[in-house]
Each structure stands twice: as structure tokens, then as C-alpha cells.
């Protein structure tokens, strides 16, 4: 018979194992920035929409190519007459019924070759859609990065708020003890309780903001269920070290050659020029070539029945007057060409401003980071010193509240500066058009190291 102690030990072990398994099963998934990039590229509806646009343009090229090939069609006919009819001589002029079938091969082309222009436009449109897809992916990755760092900032904000509540709780308890022994007045305790209540409300607000930012990130990436974020060394692989320069001109030159939006508009300019040429082709005549094989059978056969015939035809169509339609279409195509040129120049100016703004933001964040780190160190030392002075009656409640406020402000500003500095680097990568290339290159390097 088993001893009761052994049975109890087995039961406790079973419960612990079960609890551990359930905890690991329902534990929140952890994602790094690398993981979020991969998931976003796979699940994003916006990226999939852009991929469908690319698929549509590829099919448009197939349709433009199909126009260049002749069309082969078959036809057939069966006719039942009320009766056959004959001449007085007995010759049949209307059969009882007849059947016919045949094959038709025809091709229509404009002398201007506008069908070839349409095929050329369709090929250029594919390249444009590829650049558009690249730009969508890159912009989406930056959106993921921004949401990722928003969550990390709010996590730190929650930690700061919790630490603030703990400090103020200790201060309130210390104030309560000193009130009991008569060292300080009750107003000091009331002030401490008021500050603690405010800190607790800030903690609730920070926790709610954290939940909101996590929901936004989950929506952008396509995550389901609860999750946590982790900062890994691989995340820093996406942060190149920019040298502080006097101007942002080198970055602008890179953007002019790398930005997918600019490449897309450059192709759009070519398409607009080809579209004008395509529309002008309406002034040229269209030539149609047709070849037909025809077979007919009648019962009873008429005297003029030709059972088989093969013939070809050539037709030239030249529209002389269409109410000014062709001229209006050419003018419209030219106007669209001018629009594309204006959009292209406007995009260049916008990119230059984006570079300037991102570069100055990067310089600002990098410049203030060291100062805020020093300020945080001083604020911590100051709070520790004032706390000790308060314990010995050398500082009052206002002094410790001021020291605590300075510490909380320094912590928040330092955390914001750390993550804003990282995001400013990614923003520079985005506005120069190198973010997606950098991400894919780093992911390839990381995967090769894992293998």
C-alpha cells in the first residue's frame, strides 16, 4: 500500500506540471521588431491590395499583346424553309433546308502602330506598379516601426508611473509616521496623499494608453490575441550610424536615386508621353485583313449551290469627321502629360523637405539624448539626497515633491528621446528610400547566421 506522503508528493508534482504546461500554452507571444516586419509583409491588407494592382497590370499587358495577334473564329448556320421552290423547268431555286459553316481569320491594325504603343505602355505600367508596391511596403514598414516604438514608450511610461506610485507611497507612509510623532503637520500628509492619488490616476492613464497602442500595432501588423514586445540586438541592426554633417545634401542625392515614388513618377512621365503618341494614332486610318473559308450544303441542292469557297478581303477605314472627338482626346492626353510633369516636380520638392525635416529631427534627438541622460542621473541623485534630508527633517514636503516631479519628468523625457532617436534613424532610411532594402538585407544576414 502506498504511503500518504508519497501520494501527496505525486499529486503536488502533477499539479505543478499541469500549471506549467498551461502557463506556457496560454502565455502571450513575444515579438521583436524583426518578427513584426516579417508578419506585416505577409499579412498586410494594404500590401496585398498593391500586389493585386500589380497582378492587374500584368494581365493588362497580356490583353495588349492579344490585340497584336489575328483572331480566328468559327461560325455555323442551319436554315429550315417552309418548302422547296422550283422553276417551271424543274430547277430548284429554294431548298427544303440548308446548312453552312466556316472559319474566319481577321486582323485590324492602325497604320500608326498605336497597338504597339499600347503594348509598350502596358509593359511600362508593370514597372510602375512594381515601384508602387515597393513604396507601399516601405511606408508600411515605417508605420510598423512607429507603432512598435509607441508601444515601447508606453511600456516605459507604465513602469515610470508604477515607480512613481511606489515612491509616493513610501513618502506618504513616512509622512504618516512623522505626523503621529508630531514632527510635521497633517497638511504635509494630505499633500502626500493628494500627490499619490494623482500618481495613481497617471498610472491608470498610462496603462490604458499602453492597451491602445498595442491594439493599434496589432491592427497594423495583423496580430491576434495578447502579445508582448521584446527588444533584441537584431533590432539595432536596422539602425545605421549616420555621421553628423553640416548639410543634408548627400542624403537628398541618395533619395533622388532611391525613392520608389520618384521612380514610379518617372515611368509615369514616359507613359504620359507614349499616351499622347497613342492618342494621335486616331488620326491615322485602320487597315483590316480578313480571310474566310465557307462551306454550304442544301437539301435538295439548288442549281447555283457553291459548296466550298475561300476568299480574302482588305479594308481601309479612314474617319474624316467625328465632331472634334480625336482632337479633344489628344488635348486631354497632353494635359495629363503636363499634370504628371508637375506632380513629378512637386514630389522632388516634397522629398527634399522630408529629408531636411528628418535630418534635423535626427540631429535634434541625437543632440538632446546625452543631455537628458545626464539630467536623469542628476534627478535620481537629487531625489535620493532630498529623501534622506526629509527623513532627518532637513527638507520639507515641497522639496521632496519638487524632486519627485523632476525625476518623473526626466525619466519620461529620456525614454521618449531614446526611442525617438531610433525612430528618427528609421525615418531617414524611409525618406531616402533605403528602409525596405536595409530590412531585407539585414534579415538575410540574420537568417544566414542562424543557419
Name these PLM-found stretches.
Residues 6, 31, 139-254, 358-361, ...:
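Periplasmic alpha-helical coiled-coil/stalk elements that build and connect Gram-negative outer-membrane
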Residues 9-23:
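Bacterial N-terminal signal peptides
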Residues 26, 225, 413-451:
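Acidic, low-complexity, intrinsically disordered peripheral segments
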Residues 26-77, 83, 108, 225, ...:
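Bacterial Sec-pathway N-terminal export signals of envelope proteins
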Residues 48, 71-95, 106-135, 263, ...:
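Small/polar (Gly/Ser/Thr/Ala-rich) solvent-exposed segments
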Residues 49-64, 136-160, 170, 177, ...:
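Amphipathic alpha-helical coiled-coil segments
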Residues 99-105, 251, 310-316:
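Hydrophobic, lipid-facing positions within transmembrane beta-strands of outer-membrane proteins
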Residues 123, 186-195, 397-405:
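Short, charged, amphipathic alpha-helical segments
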Amino acid at each position: 500500500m502506498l504511503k500518504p506522503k508519497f501520494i501527496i508528493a505525486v499529486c503536488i508534482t502533477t499539479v505543478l506540471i499541469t500549471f506549467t504546461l498551461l502557463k506556457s500554452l496560454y502565455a502571450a507571444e513575444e515579438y521583436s521588431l524583426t518578427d513584426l516586419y516579417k508578419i506585416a509583409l505577409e499579412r498586410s491588407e494594404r500590401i496585398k491590395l498593391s500586389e493585386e494592382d500589380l497582378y492587374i497590370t500584368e494581365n493588362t499587358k497580356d490583353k495588349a499583346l492579344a490585340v497584336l495577334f489575328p483572331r480566328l473564329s468559327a461560325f455555323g448556320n442551319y436554315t429550315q424553309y417552309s418548302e422547296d421552290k422550283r422553276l417551271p423547268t424543274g430547277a430548284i431555286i429554294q431548298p427544303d433546308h440548308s446548312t453552312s459553316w466556316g472559319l474566319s481569320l481577321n486582323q485590324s491594325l492602325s497604320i500608326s502602330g498605336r497597338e504597339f504603343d499600347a503594348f509598350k505602355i502596358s509593359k511600362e505600367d508593370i514597372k510602375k506598379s512594381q515601384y508602387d508596391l515597393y513604396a507601399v511596403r516601405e511606408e508600411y514598414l515605417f508605420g510598423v516601426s512607429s507603432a512598435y516604438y509607441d508601444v515601447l514608450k508606453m511600456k516605459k511610461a507604465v513602469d515610470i508611473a508604477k515607480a512613481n506610485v511606489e515612491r509616493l507611497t513610501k513618502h506618504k507612509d513616512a509622512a504618516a509616521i512623522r505626523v503621529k510623532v508630531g514632527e510635521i503637520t497633517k497638511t504635509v500628509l494630505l499633500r502626500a496623499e493628494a500627490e499619490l492619488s494623482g500618481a495613481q490616476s497617471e498610472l491608470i492613464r498610462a496603462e490604458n494608453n499602453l492597451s491602445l497602442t498595442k491594439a493599434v500595432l496589432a491592427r497594423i501588423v495583423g496580430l491576434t490575441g495578447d502579445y508582448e514586445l521584446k527588444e533584441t540586438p537584431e533590432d539595432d541592426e536596422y539602425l545605421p550610424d549616420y555621421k553628423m554633417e553640416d548639410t543634408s545634401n548627400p542624403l537628398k542625392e541618395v533619395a533622388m536615386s532611391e525613392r520608389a515614388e520618384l521612380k514610379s513618377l518617372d515611368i509615369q512621365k514616359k507613359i504620359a508621353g507614349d499616351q499622347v503618341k497613342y492618342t494621335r494614332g486616331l488620326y491615322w486610318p485602320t487597315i483590316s485583313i480578313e480571310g474566310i473559308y465557307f462551306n454550304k450544303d442544301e437539301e435538295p441542292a439548288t442549281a447555283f449551290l457553291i459548296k466550298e469557297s475561300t476568299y480574302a478581303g482588305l479594308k481601309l477605314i479612314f474617319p474624316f469627321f467625328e465632331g472634334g472627338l480625336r482632337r479633344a482626346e489628344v488635348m486631354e492626353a497632353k494635359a495629363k502629360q503636363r499634370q504628371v510633369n508637375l506632380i513629378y516636380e512637386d514630389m522632388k520638392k516634397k522629398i527634399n523637405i522630408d529629408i531636411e525635416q528628418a535630418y534635423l529631427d535626427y540631429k535634434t534627438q541625437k543632440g538632446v539624448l546625452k543631455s537628458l541622460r545626464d539630467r536623469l542621473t542628476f534627478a535620481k541623485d537629487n531625489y535620493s539626497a532630498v529623501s534622506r534630508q526629509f527623513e532627518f527633517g532637513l527638507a520639507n514636503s515641497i522639496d521632496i515633491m519638487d524632486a519627485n516631479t523632476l525625476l518623473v519628468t526626466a525619466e519620461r523625457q529620456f525614454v521618449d528621446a531614446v526611442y525617438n532617436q531610433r525612430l528618427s534613424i528609421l525615418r531617414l532610411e524611409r525618406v531616402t528610400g533605403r528602409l525596405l532594402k536595409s530590412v531585407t538585407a539585414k534579415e538575410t544576414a540574420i537568417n544566414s547566421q542562424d543557419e
